[in-house]
Amino acid sequence: MKEALSSFDVTAVVKELQRYVDWNLDKVYQPTREHLILALKSRGEGKEFINFFVGKWLFRSTKTKEMPQQPTDFAMMLRKRVSNARLTGVRQQGFERIIVLTLEKDGKYELVLELFAEGNVVLVKDGIIIQPLISRTWKHRVVRARREFAFPPPIPDPSEMDQGAIMEMMKASDADIVRTLATRMNLGGRYSEEACARLGIDPHR
């Protein structure tokens, strides 16, 4: 199992999750603080599960282990707000390691799943944070209940960068090539090493 998903991995995962559009969110479980399970159901397909490990990875399954009888406060909040909501959209925020699930019930909600750094889960309605799993404050961003939600500053999307922009980014970095690709372009270590190998470039230059 990979330690964390790269932005490329998130793009692939989002494509897989499109199958759940128009399914209903049946229930939310939180077996541990870092593990959130979304149970989705469809009349024609039965029930399946999205397993989200905060800040690390996400996968879908058709089975899950027995859940704790007493839900956490965060799971209870999500059940109250979005149980039986219809999943109307799944998208990646730019090239970020962020997945946004759009849910409709008594209005439109967004469940934001963050896979970067320590990660987070944030429920948003009409641009206002209902509740985050973890409240945080940065210089450029505040994630707290009843505050306006903002995504982190965007990272470059390599598909939208020309050769000149990539070269400028490389020149401005103090790190070696592989670390620059992994962190500044969010490619992750494995894809950065692969890119250097295919181009015949020393990754540690």
Predicted regions located by residue number:
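Phosphate/anion-contacting hairpin/loop surfaces
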Residues: 2-3, 7, 20, 43-205
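N-terminal-proximal low-complexity accessory segments that begin disordered
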Residues: 5-41, 45
